[in-house]
Amino acid sequence: MLKLIIPTVMLLPLTWLSKTHMIWINTTTHSLIISFIPLLFLNQTNSNLSSYSLLFSSDPLSTPLLMLTTWLLPLMIMASQHHLSNEPPSRKKLYLSMLISLQISLIMTFTATELIMFYILFETTLIPTLIIITRWGNQPERLNAGTYFLFYTLVGSLPLLIALTHTHNTLGSLNIMLLTLTARELTDSWSNSLMWLAYTMAFMMKMPLYGVHLWLPKAHVEAPIAGSMVLAAVLLKLGGYGMMRLTIILDPLTKHMAYPFLVLSLWGMIMTSSICLRQTDLKSLIAYSSVSHMALVVAAILIQTPWSFTGATTLMIAHGLTSSLLFCLANSNYERTHSRIMILSQGLQTLLPLMALWWLLASLTNLALPPTINLLGELSVLMAMFSWSNITILLTGLNMLITALYSLYMFITTQRGTPSHHINNMKPSSTRENTLMLMHLFPILLLSLNPSIIAGLTY
């Protein structure tokens, strides 16, 4: 694992030692090279974690998430260039250092084998994200958003720490490899049910589950572009990853406990999709669509069949790339119109025709058009849900319909119509932006050729 962690750590001195005009080139190039390292971890056997060391190892569940995390750093750096253009060099370097330290802690979180280690790193990701939101956000409300983000995450994860120490006392170890061998089956007693709640609540707040999702739209709307990208693409996936990892400890109690949470996530999926139809704020719409997609992942993980796990992993990767792409597009609109209101940026297709193509492709991937991996993930989850209970097909089918509606509503509102009067002079789309959009779409299209590499543990 050090062959991934050490080069990423070395990005920090690289950032601070680069000359002012070379900061962007150096960091982007090096982080792009680093993003190819996780490809070495593919094609592993399913039965064991590839044990690189006692503390860090990877398996078919963490490798796709590592690929996503590392691929996102050069994209975040490319996306941030414009809004940092007026900052002094030291401020730029500090910003990049925050992104890199966030990347390091995320890589270590996804590869940690010791659960206490995983918990500490899971909490560490909070600090750089909080600094990025509260220091580089646009509006004064960013402080409020930061408070929400901090307290939701901390309140959720304190019971997790207590539950982990309890498990450590009873089983004597928290190593994932050992737990597969030693974990005992939980009975459905009151104390065990509380422990199950303590374990899953932290991750459900991170996902976020409908009901504890209020921090997400706030954080997304106020964050700068790189903050939004990493929040949507990777930080939400920490919740799903943690829930999948802890199934070993919580089995078979999940079957007793999952029912209310399944209902809540299905209901929340419909509610948040419906909220999207009434949104005027572009970033808020994409944030709520993230909640509705992740609700599907929560439901899939709680069902706990091999098929639903495959669907959940695929959907997490697909959603990470798609929502990050949508935030980039929203940001490119914001940099030109200086407003997040969709109606004010209508008619942009006539002014930026190539951007309209990216918007169309992004909207279509968001509504899970075949042959994208979004569709594969949603279909796997849909089939798993249907075999669990036939009635769920009504809710999930309705959700797919509403998703298609708000994706096309978003596309039509921002691109079609007559341009507003305040858009007289507008910068054309730069090569940097077009490359950025292409680098989001490229993995989505390539993975649809061989989706088995992101299908997770059970494939």
From Swiss-Prot:
Its EC number is 7.1.1.2. It catalyses: a ubiquinone + NADH + 5 H(+)(in) = a ubiquinol + NAD(+) + 4 H(+)(out). It is an enzyme of class 7 (translocase). Keywords: Electron transport, Membrane, Mitochondrion, Mitochondrion inner membrane, NAD, Respiratory chain, Translocase, Transmembrane, Transmembrane helix, Transport, Ubiquinone. GO terms for molecular function: NADH dehydrogenase (ubiquinone) activity; ubiquinone binding. Its main location: mitochondrion. GO terms for cellular component: mitochondrial inner membrane. It is found in: Mitochondrion inner membrane. One of its GO terms (biological process) is electron transport coupled proton transport. It is a multi-pass membrane protein. The chain crosses the membrane at residues 22-42, 60-80, 94-110, 113-133, 145-165, 196-216, 224-244, 257-277, 284-303, 308-330, 341-361, 391-411, 436-456. PANTHER family: NADH-UBIQUINONE OXIDOREDUCTASE CHAIN 4. Core subunit of respiratory chain NADH dehydrogenase (Complex I) which is composed of 45 different subunits. Core subunit of the mitochondrial membrane respiratory chain NADH dehydrogenase (Complex I) which catalyzes electron transfer from NADH through the respiratory chain, using ubiquinone as an electron acceptor. Essential for the catalytic activity and assembly of complex I. Belongs to the complex I subunit 4 family. This is NADH-ubiquinone oxidoreductase chain 4. It comes from Pongo pygmaeus.
